[in-house]
């Protein structure tokens, strides 16, 4: 039996968002990300007939991301349904869609390290909840948690609705991969850079 090379993925860094879907808007860097937790939920339903299971139906996958931050930028406040008024924020209830990406580190059993990019398309954000830490005995930072719902985007390339794109940095795609520091990347960006 031959196993694949053993790897471990860890850390979350360089979390960034666009102001609109498709990676065409300005790249917004998120500061103070303490947790970035994608989760997929897919329910099934057994349909009974003739005293047995006739069929099992699968509901569509629901992709959400729970993010903990120690602070939010003005752009992130707008994503959560706030509008800036006179230097402060009011809850407008308008949730603009955006794309979000992050970098993780992949350690291999042979000692090599590389980066992995995860991009999520057409996300919307609910408002944040705030931790109730108090400074009784020691200083505890407030943690702000919000949940994103990822709806996906059709890029017109025959792949249908794309909710998530994941790629590991290689020597062949490094030039394109490294542009993640200046823009939100799409699968089509890697056509010329290779896999």
Per-region residue spans from a language model:
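OB-fold ssDNA-binding interfaces and closely related basic DNA-contact patches used
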Residues: 31, 54, 79-83
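Polar/acidic, low-complexity leader/linker segments enriched in S/T/G and N/D
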Residues: 1-37, 192-195
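Short helix-loop boundary/capping segments
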Residues: 93-130, 134
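Mixed-charge, glycine-accented linear interaction segment located at domain edges/termini
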Residues: 124-195
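Charged, amphipathic alpha-helical segments
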Residues: 72-93
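Oligomerization/assembly interface segments of phage tail-like spikes and tubes
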Residues: 52-78, 140-154
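Short structured motifs
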Residues: 49-53, 131-134
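N-terminal "mature-chain" segments and other terminal, solvent-exposed stretches
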Residues: 39-50
């Amino acid at each position: 039996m031959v196993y694949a090379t053993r790897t471990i993925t860890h850390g979350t860094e360089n979390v960034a968002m666009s102001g609109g879907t498709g990676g065409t808007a300005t790249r917004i860097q998120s500061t103070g990300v303490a947790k970035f937790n994608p989760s997929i939920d897919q329910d099934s339903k057994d349909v009974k007939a003739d005293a047995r299971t006739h069929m099992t139906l699968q509901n569509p996958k629901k992709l959400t991301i729970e993010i903990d931050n120690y602070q939010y930028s003005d752009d992130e406040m707008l994503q959560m349904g706030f509008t800036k008024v006179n230097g402060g924020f009011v809850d407008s209830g308008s949730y603009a869609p955006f794309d979000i990406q992050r970098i993780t580190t992949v350690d291999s059993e042979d000692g090599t390290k590389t980066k992995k990019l995860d991009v999520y398309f057409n996300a919307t954000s609910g408002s944040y909840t705030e931790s109730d830490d108090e400074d009784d005995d020691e200083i505890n930072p407030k943690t702000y948690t919000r949940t994103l719902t990822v709806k996906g985007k059709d890029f017109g390339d025959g792949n249908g609705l794309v909710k998530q794109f994941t790629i590991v940095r290689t020597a062949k795609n490094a030039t394109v991969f490294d542009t993640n520091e200046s823009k939100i990347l799409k699968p089509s960006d890697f056509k010329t850079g290779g896999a």
